[in-house]
A protein has these predicted regions:
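Acidic catalytic/metal-coordinating carboxylates
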Residues: 9, 33-36, 59-65
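Charged docking surfaces used in two-component/phosphorelay signaling
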Residues: 15-23
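Short hydrophobic/Thr-rich beta-strand motif most characteristic of the beta2 strand and flanking loop
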Residues: 25-32, 40
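Short amphipathic alpha-helix used as the core "switch/output" element in two-component signaling
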Residues: 39, 61-74
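Active-site beta3 strand of CheY-like receiver
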Residues: 44-50
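Receiver (REC) domain active-site loop signature in two-component systems and cognate sites
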Residues: 55
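C-terminal output helix
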Residues: 105-114
């Protein structure tokens, strides 16, 4: 079973996505801020992280940079953000994200991107 870490600071969004990911057959853990995401990623080593870009304590981009510094590219990271501007995409890729998805989440597109990332891992 593939392991997904969902880093999302909004409780309702995190719980809803965790339920959907669990029903889709993934083992899922949640993180409510960037520091929590970093801690879980380093300890649990999921196959993929869905990383909200804007979170308290540590941003998703800073958490991604730290994951990359500690673990390299061993974990796939998909950035989740409400900002679809090119600058936002570039910032995500510069931080080390493998892919980019906008919020609100388009479930079929997110699943397609997750499958693409996990297949090439």
């Amino acid at each position: 079973m593939q392991r997904i870490l969902l880093a999302e600071d909004h409780d309702d969004n995190r719980e809803m996505l965790m339920r959907r990911l669990t029903r889709a057959g993934f083992e899922v853990r949640g993180a409510s801020d960037g520091q929590d995401a970093l801690t879980h990623a380093l300890a649990w080593k999921p196959d993929l992280v869905l990383m909200d870009v804007s979170m308290p304590i540590m941003s998703g981009l800073d958490a991604t940079r730290m994951i990359r510094a500690k673990l390299g590219a061993t974990i796939k990271v998909i950035a989740l953000t409400a900002h679809a501007m090119n600058e936002s995409r570039e910032a995500c890729f510069e931080a080390g994200c493998d892919a980019f998805a906008t919020k609100p989440v388009d479930w079929p597109n997110l699943m397609e991107e997750m499958n693409r990332q996990l297949r090439f891992w």
